[in-house]
Amino acid sequence: MPGRERRDGGRSADENKSNDRNERRGGGRRDDRRNQQQDERSQYIERVVTINRVSKVVKGGRRFSFTALVIVGDGQGMVGVGYGKAKEVPAAIQKGAEEARKNFFRVPMVGGTITHPVQGEAAAGIVMLKPAAPGTGVIAGGAARPVLECAGIQDILSKSLGSDNAINVVHATVDGLKQLVRPEEVAARRGKTVEEVAPARILRARAGQEA
């Protein structure tokens, strides 16, 4: 009819179908990316250590936001720590987890425990870590336990010698884990064989793994 307006803005039926197909493709790609991100996150162990609310005084009053300290690991020697800040708690946790994955590092282990005693320090936090015999479990409390569990350490002795602040304890634990070296590295540095520098328990644990 002459006076009737076209609701599709003058587009033909073929153009409308093409646009519908493009929208479905775009939505499918977004769904694929979302599913891929969920799969990647499900592969890791996440632990939220602390959530704090912080406020900022502005002209109109106070603005509140949240910070989250998150530990992420694969349970097989890889672990990282992240700190996220956002206006909502879930967003802060997500940002912390993303930063933790960017900060991944590998922890040298033999038979489910660390390779040698070490002491980590960060600010006022001091954490002592010692290898333990199989079956001991993770003897750790407070904020150090999530770091060790996410790294996949099964047997270890730890003790906090400094501040009880969770952030300091976490970073002191990470500092200690980063100081660990493999027996092969020590042997190469000293110009000796692994059997000459490694304790007997390390050699037994390695033999058990290879068997």
From Swiss-Prot:
What this protein is reported to do is described as: With S4 and S12 plays an important role in translational accuracy. Located at the back of the 30S subunit body where it stabilizes the conformation of the head with respect to the body.
Q: Domain description from the entry? A: The N-terminal domain interacts with the head of the 30S subunit; the C-terminal domain interacts with the body and contacts protein S4. The interaction surface between S4 and S5 is involved in control of translational fidelity.
- Family according to the record: Belongs to the universal ribosomal protein uS5 family.
Which HAMAP family does the entry link to?
A: Ribosomal_uS5_B
For whether the record's keyword set contains Methyltransferase, the answer is: no
Alphabetical GO CC annotations of the entry are:
small ribosomal subunit
Q: Which Pfam families match?
A: Ribosomal_S5 (PF00333), Ribosomal_S5_C (PF03719)
> Residues annotated as region Disordered?
1-41
Gene name, per UniProt, is: rpsE
Q: Which UniProt keywords apply?
A: Ribonucleoprotein, Ribosomal protein, RNA-binding, rRNA-binding
Q: How does it assemble?
A: Part of the 30S ribosomal subunit. Contacts proteins S4 and S8.
User: Which cysteine pairs are joined by S-S bonds?
Assistant: none
The protein's name: Small ribosomal subunit protein uS5
Gene Ontology terms: biological process:
translation
Q: Where is the S5 DRBM domain?
A: 44-107
The record's GO molecular-function terms, alphabetically, read: rRNA binding; structural constituent of ribosome
